[in-house]
Amino acid sequence: DTTYPADKIPHVLAFLINNNLDFVTCNRLDRMDPDAMSLTHQIGNWGLTFGTNLFHGINIKDSQSGMWVFKKEVISKVNLTSDGMPLSEEFKIEAFKRGLRAVEIPVPFHARVGEVKLNTWEDGIWNLWFLVTKMKDFR
């Protein structure tokens, strides 16, 4: 859909390897094209990221980014329960809360080619509910 910069994948992988990291997530919001995301989705991303940081005690700028890389062995160190929209925020929560060597780096984000696949309210509410219920995993 051309939103994420595929040409940056080698850079993100090199960053992971060269810095001896376990997980790298990408922040789209700081380098986003003006027409890449509706105002409603920008507000939703801000709210979900705020909730992720508040409820889970981490500090990231883009909890909803779907561009991330990780070492294969990370899978055995995280407890992933979602197979839907919350997977992205869950993976970040798990990586940062479980003490993995994890960082967030900025990447460009472009306007989608084709239709937006998000159901704004349903997906947003589901992700928010997931953030609340995920807190039980770290009590």
What residues fall within each predicted segment?
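The conserved acidic donor/metal-binding loop of glycosyltransferases
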Residues: D1-T3
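A charged, well-structured terminal subsegment
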Residues: F138-R139
